[in-house]
Amino acid sequence: MQKGQTTPFAVRKMNSNKKKQLFILAALCLALLAGGVSLGFISANRTGQTVSLFVDADDTPDSVLYKVDEIGEPFSVLGLRGFMTVSRYGAHVHPGRYDIDPGTSIYRIFRRLRAGQQTPVRLVIPASLRTVEALAAKLGANLQADSAAWMALFRDTVALKEFKVDTSTLPCLFIPDTYEVFWTVEPIVVLRKMNKNYRRFWTDARLVKAREAGLSPYEVVTLASIVEQETANEAEKPMVAGMYINRLRQGMKLQADPTVKFALRRFDLRRILHEHLAVESPYNTYHVEGLPPGPICLPSKSSVESVLNYARHPYIYMCAKEDFSGTHNFAATYADHLANARRYSAALDSRGIK
């Protein structure tokens, strides 16, 4: 055998070593694959309840991993980092709110994050929100845009022209209900959604009733907001609405106590005194004639319907009942009204309410 020539035995030995190396490499790959798969099934939520993962516009893969680490099982971040690295997640960071149920796997949440499959926000607009500031705070607490961004839109006279409202009549567009939007939605998009819903609410039948009452849709909502604050008794709402419509038709000032509270921003007042009536404000209906320039709260649909279907009666006065039931005594004459007012005042005094 010449020098340097490989024997058949040596060739078989080399082939055997290569096979061993390939086997070990394959085993390692399978182990890594199995480990990756196992990591993919680790829960992204260890809290035992549904939690929301908020991804901001300036988040990076590392900051997302940090947020997941606060709620996920041990090693969940390791699995998520692997998926992010392989898929180049850094180029696909989608802002949004992602609700994670208990037991949701890292792989499943990764797929949602990479695809930007947000969880819709159930945005509840409650009745009786009193000011645009309170409305902005409510929206800012539930959506990505903060209250300052909402107030900037609410005061943007150019933007509001699209909806034919100003800051005073803007609340008319927000009909109390539950809406589905994404957390990242732009404020102007929400306003367009509210406007569309508002236009849908005002059917031909409702518009006819508004005209018969001598009111525009915005005026109906404004009067409904006063009714909303005057009584929580659903059966009494049409009576209250009818009383105010009677006063409007007779050219009388509304003299609605809730408008004084709104003008003062003193919503805790339990007793309106003469000193309170002196406030100079277009919302103080003891001073101004007709309706205030806009709603004093977001009225419920039932309050709006009570104005459209107001009770026909002769009453032009009302006073809270002395039994503090939340309902009212109605009167057609000032003398009867004074008698009702004296009884209520005496009841306040007896309870030490000032």
Specify the residue positions occupied by each region the protein language model found.
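Short low-complexity stretches enriched in small and charged residues
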Residues: 19-23, 50-55, 91-93, 133-134, ...
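Signal peptide-directed extracytoplasmic domains
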Residues: 44-202
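Bacterial extracytoplasmic/cell-wall-associated proteins, especially those involved in peptidoglycan
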Residues: 60, 144-148, 159-354
